[in-house]
């Protein structure tokens, strides 16, 4: 089983990346959050991997963080949620935010995520509350991120351009250290370059 891949980003798609590891290109399915956190094409990337073996295919799912992988693995244990659905859910909500919503039985918040209806949200709360409790406690109460100013404007601009909030958050956070003294348009160009890979 493959647990981790490290290599060059050969290409990026809407929901996947091809990672060149020793001359072999691995197609790895990713959430929007993990995809946004990867460097542009040609850069070095490292992903945690879940290998899904089906009768007709072997699929690799990648994660930029241990938390996202843990939530993904918990999601696929829920009846009716397969790897693709779990990936789509994690593209619509951050792993820690999902854990907090489940821990708080926030069905209304969960139903705002594309692909989660009321019944699925209720099932997630019932089946995952204990599994995700530790992660939700580690996340703590929802808190404002430091350095709101131009980084928050960048995040909002990306959402206005059609990027999902988790994608916009990841891209804006990746540029947080570079934000000081830069104008919004400069940061927006850099964020778009990274998102398009």
From Swiss-Prot:
It comes from the Bacteria. Signal peptide: none annotated. Residues 65-141 are annotated as: Domain II. GO terms for cellular component: cytoplasm; Holliday junction helicase complex; Holliday junction resolvase complex. Residues 141-145 are annotated as: Flexible linker. Its main location: cytoplasm. It is found in: Cytoplasm. Residues 146-197 are annotated as: Domain III. One of its GO terms (molecular function) is four-way junction helicase activity. Keywords: Cytoplasm, DNA damage, DNA recombination, DNA repair, DNA-binding. Residues 1-64 are annotated as: Domain I. Homotetramer. Forms an RuvA(8)-RuvB(12)-Holliday junction (HJ) complex. HJ DNA is sandwiched between 2 RuvA tetramers; dsDNA enters through RuvA and exits via RuvB. An RuvB hexamer assembles on each DNA strand where it exits the tetramer. Each RuvB hexamer is contacted by two RuvA subunits (via domain III) on 2 adjacent RuvB subunits; this complex drives branch migration. In the full resolvosome a probable DNA-RuvA(4)-RuvB(12)-RuvC(2) complex forms which resolves the HJ. Has three domains with a flexible linker between the domains II and III and assumes an 'L' shape. Domain III is highly mobile and contacts RuvB. Belongs to the RuvA family. The RuvA-RuvB-RuvC complex processes Holliday junction (HJ) DNA during genetic recombination and DNA repair, while the RuvA-RuvB complex plays an important role in the rescue of blocked DNA replication forks via replication fork reversal (RFR). RuvA specifically binds to HJ cruciform DNA, conferring on it an open structure. The RuvB hexamer acts as an ATP-dependent pump, pulling dsDNA into and through the RuvAB complex. HJ branch migration allows RuvC to scan DNA until it finds its consensus sequence, where it cleaves and resolves the cruciform DNA. HAMAP family: DNA_HJ_migration_RuvA. This is Holliday junction branch migration complex subunit RuvA. It comes from Anaeromyxobacter sp. (strain Fw109-5). The lineage of its organism: Bacteria, Pseudomonadati, Myxococcota, Myxococcia, Myxococcales.
């Amino acid at each position: 089983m493959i647990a981790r891949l490290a290599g060059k980003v050969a290409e990026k798609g809407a929901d996947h990346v091809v990672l060149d590891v020793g001359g072999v290109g691995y197609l790895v399915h990713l959430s929007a959050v993990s995809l946004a956190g990867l460097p542009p094409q040609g850069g070095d990337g490292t992903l945690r991997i879940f290998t899904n073996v089906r009768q007709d295919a072997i699929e690799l799912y990648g994660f930029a963080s241990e938390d996202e992988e843990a939530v993904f693995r918990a999601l696929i244990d829920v009846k009716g949620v397969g790897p693709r659905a779990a990936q789509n859910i994690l593209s619509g909500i951050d792993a820690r935010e999902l854990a907090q919503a489940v821990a708080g039985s926030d069905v209304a918040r969960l139903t705002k995520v594309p692909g989660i209806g009321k019944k699925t949200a209720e099932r997630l709360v019932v089946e995952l509350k204990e599994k995700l409790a530790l992660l939700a406690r580690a996340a703590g109460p929802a808190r404002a991120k430091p350095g709101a100013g131009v980084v928050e404007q960048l995040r909002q601009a990306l959402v206005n351009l059609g990027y999902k909030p988790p994608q916009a958050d990841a891209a804006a956070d990746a540029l947080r250290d570079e934000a000081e003294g830069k104008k919004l348009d400069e940061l927006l160009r850099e964020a778009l370059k990274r998102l398009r890979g």
